[in-house]
């Protein structure tokens, strides 16, 4: 039983992907072994005094996977299911994501095993400060730069920053990204992931389906990423014909006003109450007729059972891992292009880079300038990947090509530095 759990763990899945790509790149086992292990894993015990006076204990981690291309970069999540395995796997994914986007970073990830809904604001602040007290020696604007992730936000980063300054005496705002604007954050960080998804969808549409103008788009998941992806795609001339959230969705061939849809979601709790169109389940939405499908909610929603029924001509992964390996293979056989999450949802970390770079230079950037930098970086990354795929790995899918390009860059950097 334990072997089954281990074999299906996120970390094991990532190592398998690495070895598969390593074979294509002709990497030896020694190199792959080095790449599969984090350079450092920090495990900490965090104890806080609850508002009821009782001591509460939580486990936390920070995984620093690889620093060949620069300081570690990646979010910190608060979730009851956080494990060391998950944090290590996510830090590895961040290494490849940062490499693919040509960002001057390695990969890192942090997490605390906690249900934040069960803590008061005061307890959350205490937890956040204690986490930094435990790991501050391993952080720095040129060492490891955390950011928000699941259940953490700009307020969490503000607590992190304040605690870091108190302990170290260094007033260095670039140690954390995703901060409030008052503390050197940038406004576009709010929508940078959705902007990135829309930008990639437009570029991919130009290459695979003849452009984004009038393209019919379905978005599964109407949270921050889904909403902003829809908003920007609408502005680019696409027609949003379907949206959904956890309660279900709506299809309207004439087009959905995303501004109106988000208002209805905020007022009633779900986009399923959008008045014009027909109500559908999430399962029905994924196999509805469209040109571009953007799964922006949960992982593994497109699998071997529904992949043969998907009618989209192009899939852009807004969520992390929305397609299973079986679904990937089915899409490849059907000739449906899939732009992988490692690129499609990387707008968030590009936004973080813009914030970090401006903090380092002591500059204040306008939202328009920041937006342009994110769009340009995403466009360049997509076109570089597309060319690499066409020239070197045309027989494989875009996901394999993205991983190969990212791993190759890290290996070259490690060789140049004499690590390998």
Curated annotation (Swiss-Prot):
SUPFAM superfamilies: Aminoacid dehydrogenase-like, N-terminal domain (SSF53223), NAD(P)-binding Rossmann-fold domains (SSF51735). It is an enzyme of class 1 (oxidoreductase). The modification N6-methyllysine is found at residues 254, 260, 372, 391-392. It comes from Saccharolobus solfataricus (strain ATCC 35092 / DSM 1617 / JCM 11322 / P2) (Sulfolobus solfataricus). The keyword Oxidoreductase applies. SMART domains: ELFV_dehydrog. This is Glutamate dehydrogenase 2. Methylation of lysine residues may play a role in the thermal stability of this enzyme. Gene3D superfamilies: Leucine Dehydrogenase, chain A, domain 1, NAD(P)-binding Rossmann-like Domain. Homohexamer. Pfam families: ELFV_dehydrog, ELFV_dehydrog_N. The keyword Nuclease does not apply. PROSITE patterns: GLFV_DEHYDROGENASE. Belongs to the Glu/Leu/Phe/Val dehydrogenases family. The active site is at 109. GO terms for molecular function: glutamate dehydrogenase (NAD+) activity; glutamate dehydrogenase (NADP+) activity. The modification N-acetylmethionine is found at residue 2. Its EC number is 1.4.1.3. It comes from the Archaea. Keywords: Acetylation, Methylation, NAD, NADP, Oxidoreductase. One of its GO terms (biological process) is glutamate catabolic process. It catalyses: L-glutamate + NAD(+) + H2O = 2-oxoglutarate + NH4(+) + NADH + H(+); L-glutamate + NADP(+) + H2O = 2-oxoglutarate + NH4(+) + NADPH + H(+).
